[in-house]
Each structure stands twice: as structure tokens, then as C-alpha cells.
């Protein structure tokens, strides 16, 4: 011990470089590697290596501090020697140090590059030799027990501990191997008395051994529990093997027998029966509590809950069918006639095979309720599958059984809900199908909607063919924007909007009665006159269907309930008339009557088709000084912009016939605007209206306020046919217009237009632009004669001569 002390004999108050340590306390006689990364600590090590100095290894109080102050460093550390130093590529330094003797810092030196401190070596107080001997033996014995419980310490450490004779070194070496917190290790380092240090080490080990023994008991208990579980599993497997030899248990036998009985009673196809029996056989060989058994049981439940060849009796009374359709829906005569034709053919052929009916029309015209009426009139069970926003193919075809929580697709789920194999299956909003990386559900529907293929529809979950050939499929859509192969499998039945008379009749027959009941009104408490009903339709709704109208009637009913309750008198009732309609319905939302109040130059009323029915389209044109440019505004699409260009070119080509001087185009700009500016517009059918506005603004002849028009134009002045004629004519009638110009080629479509619409409008077929202008302008255009001005040849100066030669003058 004296020799060890003489090695570190340095004058008291010597100056040492100090690298603050984090998460480690270095004890005397301890060799430990350190990784130094902070700049101050690296510079301290460089200073040590210059003169082969000693280093003071002191721990900082808070390891989280990157830039500690002297106050953040413990005052007692260990003077050590640097045995090895290695600079790493990332700038950090790996250093191997050996602890020497305890030292107490007296004062930190002023050094900005790194910490330096004056420190005095701490002399150990040895104490009585016999007591130290006893404490040493007790510590070694306790350490042996500690090593047995703490597997992290290698057994070789015990050999080196047994060879230590010095009590102080023994205490420090054992302390360095204990799993203690930094403050506890620092207490041991600061303890100068050897006997006290040994006692503290012994006490720390005593506490740690107690904790380790509890940990060991917990580990043993968990191990025993696991062994017990494994043993139970092994015995269960043996029990299953014995049960397989002797026969199933009562519960298992009852479940299997019940499933087998259901399978035998169900009218499966041969493939489905074989599959169900194979799954039942698999279920019998499984543990009832296993996860796989639950999957098989769910599969069999689905197989047994789907209707297999379980038909309901289809009604063939077509008179009853017509009566039901007429009772549920007013108007829609062409649609109902087409449905009845389809039903007649099905009854005659006694099978469903044929085109899939698809009802296409704006919202609120009764497409979904028509599907319900068809089911009611044929006696089929009704099931509806909403396809709006469906993006995953598995929604239609189902998920494979390998996935957790898998189940059949919506088609098979719908068949389970229908409880018969020949329901009416309504595929609602089929045009709203989406597609993404999970697949295209519209492609999955191709098999469902093909009469030649749907007899063997294969759901991914069932994995067997299911016959959908007896199902009557009806689709609904707002537009025909759907994949062509899907569209090819359908027969489109157009459901156009309702006329004003039809809306009045629908309100009287269905909507008023429904809302009176829904709002708790009694019979005789609420009444609305026909004139008030017409005003409600004209000034408060602007739609093809009747949804907004129903909301307005519901609003009137609520106001009536409030008024009756406020009066509080028995027999109070509310009558809505044209005079008091504003009181209950509020301010008028729409204008009804002519699109324009007077004949205006450059303002033409066009007709547009939208998903919610027809709309009036006001097309405005103005002429202003410029260089012959044409500007378009109103959020027009490419096709509509091209219509403006075609109209401009045609007007330029026939300028004199329209009474327009050709030179006018070089001096004037034309601005065409289609309000409302925020609404996107596209399509070629506004071509005739564009030409009319441009001719009107260049000639100064006003356009008739009571004329609306629709049609595509060509550069030769022909008017081409358009689509959505019924919706456009209904919009003109709603707008109070008297005359409508339509393409001559659309004259054949007038057969499908209701008589009251044809009576309310003067429909004028036109085939050329001249016909359009003749009816649209307040007076006819007057042609003018125009001669192109003769081109003036540039004068060429004669060359001047000077004497006999020619001279060029510059």
C-alpha cells in the first residue's frame, strides 16, 4: 500500500486538467475506457499527453448538461494516468485511463480552453486490522452471492477479487462492479475511511441481493407458468388424439351434427356441397378454441346463410304492376311503359335473362323509388347496394380468407339480406364508382351484370360459383359517365325531370300528405292552394326533381305547427295561399318569367343541360375599340371556346350578308361573357346563341327577350343536333319563355316531350344560321354591298443619269 501511495506522491495543491465525466465514477485501481467528444475535454487530454501529466477524473452532477460549470462538478474525484489514447475519424477520442488515488478539488484555475483545478490527495484512514479483515471476508462472501444472482458480471471477476489483500482496494474494486446510481457511487468515492467504505459496500450489496432475489422469484414463477401452459397444450393434443380414436365430445359432436344436417338440407350446387363438407371435416379435426376453427365456422355460417335456389314466387299480373307503378309515381309515362314491356317479355319467356335496366336521370326524379316499385309489382324481395364512393374491388368480390376479418363482397351480403335467390337487386349511384391502387370495382361488376356470365359468379371469400342469373338487376345513375364495357351491358332508360303540372300533382298526391304526417299535423290543420303550390315551385325551387320542393313543403308544415301551437285554440288551422306564401316561405329565391325584361343588343338566352336538369344560359357580347380580338370569360371549357371561335369565323366570312362592314373587325374587339362566372361550362350546344350575340352586337339589332335557343353550328352555317332536349325545353318552360329554337334534326325527339310542354312553348326547328337570326332578332339583318379597296402599287423612282453613265444617289 505504501508503494502504491509513493507512485502518486505529488505536492499538495497541484494543478490537474479536469475532463468532466458523464454517467461514470472512476475508482482508484480501476482501468476503464472513455469516449471523449466535447471540445474542452479533448483539449484537456491533449494537454495531458504533451507533458505526460496526471489527470483528475471527476464526474459531473447532471449528465444531461453539455456545457457544465465548476459548480456542476463533484468536488472529489480520482487522479489517474492515461494509458492509451486513440483519435477516431468522427473527431471523438477513445482513451484508456487507470485510477490512482482520491483527490479533493480545492479551487478551479482560470482557463478558457479546458477545466483545470488545484486538488489535494486524500489520505485513507485505515482503522483496526481485525475489523478490516472481518469486513473484507464478509464483503467477498456477499459478492460471491451477488455474482450468482447478477448474471451480467463475469465469474472471472471473483478470482481477481479473492487475490486482493488491501481492504481499501477491495472496497473500491467491488464498488466499481455494483449496479449503483451515480450519487451512491460518488458517496463511496468520497468516503475516506476504509472500514466505513466496506460497510457501505456490504449494505449496498445486501439491498441489491434482496431485489435480485425477488427478480429471480418472478422469473421462476413466469417460467413455471409457461411450462404449465406448454404442459396443458401437450395434454390437450393428447386428449384430442384420444378423442379422435374414441369419438368426439358431446358439444363438438352436437355442433358438427347440426352443421352437417344444415348442409344436407340446403340446396347447394355440387361444387358448393363438396366444399362445405370438406370444411366441416377440417373443423372436426381442429381444437374448438383455435383461431383457425373460428375462421372455418364463420365460413360455414356464410355458406349456410346465403339463399341457394330459394326462389320467391314472381307475380305475373301486369295490370297490378301498372296499378302499383301509377300509384307510386305520377308522370314518367315513357319510363313506366318501358318497364312494363320488359316485365311482359320476362313473364312470357319465364326467365330473367336480358339487358340490365339502368335508370339515368337527375337527382330527385324517383329512380331509386322506381326500383322499389318494380320489386313490389313483381313480388320480388328488394335489396339495395349503394356504390357511391366504392373504390375497392373487394367491396364487390369479397376478401380472400387469408386476411384477418375477411368477409364476402356486397353482392353476396345483399343476397343474404334478400333471403331469396331471385330478388330485385338495385345498384344505386353506379356512376359514382371510384378506382385506385386497390383495384377497379367497375371491372368487378362486369361479371355481375353480364347475363351470360353471372350464373357462375365467384366471390373471393366463398371460393365457389354462385348463381346470380335469377336476380333482376336495376341500376341508377345521374350521368352516363361510366366505363364503356359497363355501359355496354345496360339498357339505358332516361328519367327526365318533371313538368310544373307534374310537380303540382306529385305534391298533392304524395309530398303534402307525407310531410303533414311527418310533422305531426292532423287532418284539416294544414292546407295549401294550387296557386300557392305553383308559386312555391316557380319562385322557391329550381330543379328537375322534387327534393327541394319537398323541403319547402316541410318548411311550411313546420311553420304551421308553430303557429297552431302559438294560437293554442282548439280547431286552429293554417291555409297557405298565393297572398300569404311569402309569410311562411320567406323571400323569393328565383325569378320566374322571361330571362330578360326587355329586348337587348348582344344578350341571348341559351339552353344548357346539367346533371340536375336543364338550365337557362345568358350569353352576353359587347363590342369595344380594339384590333379585332375576341375575349371569352365565364369559366368556359375548351369546346365552348372553340364554339366562340367558329361563330366569329362564320360571322366574318358572311359579314356583308349580315350588314357588317368587313373593316369593322379590324377596329373593334368583341368580348363574350357567360354568367355565372364561377360555374364551369362546356359543350357545343351554345353555338347558335354565340352567333346570335355576335351578329346582334355588330349590327346593333336587339335580340328578342322571349326566345331561347340551342344547337351546334358549323363553319358553313348549319345547325347540328344536340342532346338533353327534354331537360332544356323544361328549363325554357320554367323560365317563362315563349319561343324555343331547336335543330331541325331534333324534331324527331319531340314525340317524347310531354304534351303540356309542347302546348306551353312554340318550338321552332331551324337548320341554318339564317333561320336562327330570322326568329331571334327583333328585325331582319340588311345585307350591304362591299367592294375590296384596290391595292395601291408602290411608286418606284426613276434612276438619275449623269452624262452617259447611271449614278445611284444615296
Curated annotation (Swiss-Prot):
Keyword Nucleotidyltransferase: no
GO-annotated cellular components: cytoplasm
Induction: By heat shock.
Catalytic activities: Hydrolysis of proteins in presence of ATP
Domain (Lon N-terminal): residue spans on this chain: 16-209
GO molecular function per UniProt: ATP binding; ATP hydrolysis activity; ATP-dependent peptidase activity; sequence-specific DNA binding; serine-type endopeptidase activity
EC number: 3.4.21.53
Domain of life: Bacteria
Active site: 685, 728
Cross-referenced Pfam families: AAA, Lon_C, Lon_lid, LON_substr_bdg
GO BP terms: cellular response to heat; protein quality control for misfolded or incompletely synthesized proteins
Enzyme class of the recorded protein, top EC level: hydrolase
Keyword vocabulary terms for this entry: ATP-binding, Cytoplasm, Hydrolase, Nucleotide-binding, Protease, Serine protease, Stress response
Amino acids binding ATP: 361-368
Keyword Secreted: no
Record localization: Cytoplasm
Record-annotated Lon proteolytic domain positions: 598-779
Subunit structure comment from the entry: Homohexamer. Organized in a ring with a central cavity.
PANTHER family given in the database record: ATP DEPENDENT LON PROTEASE FAMILY MEMBER (PTHR10046)
Function according to Swiss-Prot or TrEMBL: ATP-dependent serine protease that mediates the selective degradation of mutant and abnormal proteins as well as certain short-lived regulatory proteins. Required for cellular homeostasis and for survival from DNA damage and developmental changes induced by stress. Degrades polypeptides processively to yield small peptide fragments that are 5 to 10 amino acids long. Binds to DNA in a double-stranded, site-specific manner. Involved in iron uptake.
Family statement: Belongs to the peptidase S16 family.
UniProt-recorded name of the protein: Lon protease
Amino acid at each position: 500500500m505504501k508503494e502504491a501511495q509513493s507512485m502518486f506522491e505529488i505536492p499538495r495543491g497541484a494543478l490537474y486538467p479536469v475532463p468532466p465525466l458523464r454517467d461514470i465514477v472512476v475508482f482508484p485501481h480501476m482501468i476503464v475506457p472513455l469516449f471523449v467528444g466535447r471540445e474542452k475535454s479533448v483539449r484537456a487530454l491533449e494537454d495531458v499527453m504533451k507533458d505526460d501529466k496526471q489527470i483528475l477524473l471527476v464526474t459531473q452532477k447532471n449528465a444531461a448538461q453539455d456545457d457544465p460549470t465548476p459548480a456542476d462538478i463533484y468536488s472529489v474525484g480520482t487522479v489517474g494516468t492515461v494509458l492509451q489514447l486513440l483519435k477516431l475519424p468522427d473527431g471523438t477520442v477513445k482513451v484508456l485511463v487507470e485510477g490512482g488515488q482520491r483527490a479533493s478539488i480545492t479551487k478551479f484555475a482560470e482557463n478558457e480552453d479546458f477545466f483545470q483545478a488545484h486538488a489535494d490527495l486524500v489520505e485513507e484512514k485505515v482503522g483496526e486490522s481485525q475489523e478490516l479483515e472481518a469486513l473484507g471476508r464478509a464483503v467477498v462472501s456477499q459478492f460471491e452471492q451477488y455474482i450468482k444472482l447478477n448474471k451480467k458480471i463475469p465469474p472471472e471477476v471473483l478470482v481477481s477479487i479473492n487475490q486482493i489483500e488491501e481492504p481499501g482496494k477491495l472496497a473500491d474494486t467491488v464498488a466499481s462492479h455494483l449496479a449503483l446510481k451515480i450519487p451512491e457511487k460518488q458517496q463511496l468515492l468520497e468516503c475516506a475511511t476504509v472500514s466505513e467504505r466496506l460497510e457501505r459496500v456490504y449494505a449496498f450489496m445486501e439491498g441489491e441481493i434482496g431485489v435480485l432475489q425477488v427478480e429471480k422469484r418472478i422469473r421462476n414463477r413466469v417460467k413455471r407458468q409457461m411450462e404449465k401452459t406448454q404442459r396443458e397444450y401437450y395434454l390437450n393434443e393428447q386428449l384430442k388424439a384420444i378423442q379422435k380414436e374414441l369419438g368426439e365430445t358431446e358439444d363438438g359432436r352436437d355442433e358438427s351434427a347440426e352443421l352437417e344436417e344444415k348442409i344436407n338440407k340446403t340446396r347447394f350446387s355440387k361444387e358448393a356441397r363438396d366444399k362445405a363438407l370438406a370444411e366441416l371435416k377440417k373443423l372436426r379435426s381442429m381444437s374448438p378454441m383455435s383461431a383457425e376453427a373460428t375462421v372455418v365456422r364463420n365460413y360455414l355460417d356464410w355458406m349456410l346463410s346465403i339463399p341457394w335456389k330459394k326462389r320467391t314466387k314472381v307475380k305475373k299480373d301486369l295490370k297490378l304492376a301498372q296499378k302499383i307503378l301509377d300509384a307510386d309515381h305520377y308522370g314518367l309515362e315513357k319510363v313506366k311503359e318501358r318497364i312494363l314491356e320488359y316485365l311482359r317479355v320476362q313473364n312470357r319467356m319465364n326467365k330473367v335473362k336480358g339487358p340490365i335496366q339502368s335508370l339515368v336521370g337527375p337527382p330527385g326524379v324517383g329512380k331509386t323509388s322506381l326500383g322499389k316499385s318494380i320489386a313490389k309489382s313483381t313480388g320480388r324481395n328488394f335489396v339495395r347496394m349503394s356504390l357511391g364512393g366504392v373504390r375497392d374491388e373487394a367491396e364487390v368480390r369479397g376478401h380472400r380468407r387469408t386476411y384477418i376479418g375477411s368477409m364476402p363482397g356486397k353482392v353476396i351480403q345483399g343476397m343474404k339480406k334478400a333471403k331469396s335467390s331471385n330478388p330485385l337487386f338495385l345498384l344505386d349511384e353506379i356512376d359514382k364508382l371510384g378506382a385506385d391502387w386497390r383495384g377497379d370495382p367497375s371491372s368487378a361488376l362486369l361479371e355481375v351484370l353480364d347475363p351470360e356470365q353471372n350464373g357462375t359468379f365467384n366471390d373471393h371469400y366463398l371460393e365457389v360459383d354462385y348463381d346470380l342469373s335469377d336476380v333482376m338487376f336495376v341500376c341508377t345513375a345521374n350521368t352516363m359517365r361510366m366505363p364503356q364495357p359497363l355501359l355496354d351491358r345496360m339498357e339505358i332508360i332516361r328519367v327526365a325531370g318533371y313538368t310544373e303540372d307534374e310537380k303540382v300533382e306529385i305534391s298533392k298526391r304524395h309530398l303534402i300528405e307525407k310531410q303533414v304526417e311527418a310533422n305531426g299535423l292532423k287532418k284539416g290543420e294544414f292546407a295549401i292552394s294550387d296557386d300557392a303550390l305553383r308559386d312555391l315551385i316557380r319562385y322557391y325551387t329550381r330543379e328537375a326533381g322534387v327534393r327541394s320542393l319537398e323541403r319547402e313543403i316541410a318548411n311550411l308544415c313546420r311553420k304551421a305547427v308553430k303557429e297552431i301551437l302559438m294560437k293554442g285554440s282548439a280547431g286552429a288551422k293554417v291555409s297557405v295561399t298565393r297572398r300569404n306564401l311569402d309569410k311562411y316561405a320567406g323571400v323569393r329565391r328565383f325569378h320566374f318569367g322571361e330571362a330578360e325584361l326587355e329586348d337587348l343588343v348582344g344578350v341571348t338566352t341559351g339552353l344548357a343541360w346539367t346533371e340536375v336538369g336543364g338550365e337557362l344560359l345568358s350569353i352576353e357580347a359587347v363590342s369595344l375599340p380594339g384590333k379585332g380580338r375576341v375575349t371569352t370569360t365565364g369559366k368556359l371549357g375548351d369546346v365552348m371556346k372553340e364554339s366562340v371561335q367558329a361563330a366569329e369565323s362564320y360571322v366574318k366570312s358572311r359579314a356583308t350578308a349580315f350588314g357588317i362592314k368587313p373593316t369593322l373587325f379590324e377596329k373593334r374587339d368583341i368580348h363574350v361573357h357567360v354568367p355565372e362566372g364561377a360555374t364551369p361550362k362546356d359543350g357545343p350546344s351554345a353555338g347558335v346563341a354565340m352567333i346570335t350575340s355576335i351578329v346582334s352586337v355588330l349590327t346593333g339589332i336587339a335580340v328578342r327577350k322571349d326566345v331561347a335557343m340551342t344547337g351546334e353550328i358549323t363553319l358553313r352555317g348549319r345547325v347540328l343536333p344536340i342532346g338533353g332536349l327534354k331537360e332544356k325545353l323544361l328549363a325554357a318552360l320554367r323560365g317563362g319563355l315563349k319561343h324555343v329554337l331547336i335543330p331541325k334534326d331534333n324534331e324527331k325527339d319531340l314525340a317524347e316531350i310531354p304534351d303540356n310542354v309542347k302546348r306551353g312553348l312554340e318550338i321552332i326547328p331551324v337548320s341554318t344560321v339564317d333561320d336562327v337570326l330570322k326568329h331571334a332578332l327583333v328585325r331582319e339583318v340588311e345585307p350591304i354591298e362591299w367592294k375590296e379597296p384596290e391595292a395601291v402599287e408602290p411608286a418606284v423612282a426613276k434612276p438619275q443619269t449623269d452624262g452617259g453613265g447611271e449614278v445611284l444617289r444615296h
